[in-house]
Amino acid sequence: MAQNVKILSTGRYVPDRVLTNYDLEKMVDTSDEWITQRTGIKERRIVDGTTSTTDLAVRAAKNAMDKAGILPDDIDLVIVATVTPEMFFPSTACLVQKELKLKNAFAFDISAACSGFIYAMAIATHFIQNGFCKNALVIGAEALSRITNWSDRSTCVLFGDGAGAAILSSSDEQGILGFELGSDGENGLLLYCHAFGLSDVTYSQVKENPNFRKIYMEGNEVYKFAVKIMPYAVEKVLEKVGLSSSDIDVFIPHQANIRIIESAAKRLKIPMEKVFVNLHKYGNTSAASIPIALDEAVEEGRIKKGDKVVLVGFGGGLTWASTVIKWV
């Protein structure tokens, strides 16, 4: 019989530096009004020159571990979802393991962009259900400012840096009810970032055009994908666990764009008062978006024991993912 799994605790960390829309007005041809109306974003957090993705991940993880009162020796799995590792190897997860002295854990990264945290949750859940481990540290961490083209006004207004974490543990009660995961590689080049040195991108190309290795996005196409796939992913996972959208107490979508969030909520007939939104403060933090929002929702008392919570994300790949959680 499969072991039940619950979220034991959550944590987050964002850098101190705030980059406002008014700051961006001085960098590119844009305005606070233009950004706010089209995205809902007012500001975002940006790392300084010495802070790495690992640093962000470690702080979020430590926050989650402190809340749970769990010892380093009790963590036996670490998964980091990121598209901005500072090294190809060792993995960010192994670097986190080193910093937090998680000597009994095995550790690895996954790359699923903004869907990555839920992908990582699904992997950790199945490891725990099958008795392979008991306590998994799952982290979404990004330093997107390092791969943002700060001269492209259509994308530089969107992204921010940060990390969120959750500890998943075996439980007598069933907390995590189910998942829906998917991908569409056929349309992967609607949103991408080159890995210089490992593909057809040469050093000379990057030297001539530093923005060659930055985020590229066909915004209109990604928007059309997002407004369809988020409701689809939620409907599929609810169907799997025998629930309907009216059963949802708290809806936490990937924090990419307020118009996408409002469209998804409307299609699902979920009132906005059940939707948790914090993108006005942080922008799109990719894999960190959902765990940061989840931790804030818990901290603010938006999630109570017994609540049914839906998380859903979409991102580069193209990918999508959703999960239903009963808060126990």
Swiss-Prot record:
It is an enzyme of class 2 (transferase). Pfam families: ACP_syn_III, ACP_syn_III_C. Keywords: Acyltransferase, Cytoplasm, Fatty acid biosynthesis, Fatty acid metabolism, Lipid biosynthesis, Lipid metabolism, Multifunctional enzyme, Transferase. InterPro entries: ACP_syn_III_C (IPR013747), ACP_syn_III_N (IPR013751), FabH (IPR004655), Thiolase-like (IPR016039). It is found in: Cytoplasm. Its EC number is 2.3.1.180. Homodimer. The last Arg residue of the ACP-binding site is essential for the weak association between ACP/AcpP and FabH. This is Beta-ketoacyl-[acyl-carrier-protein] synthase III.
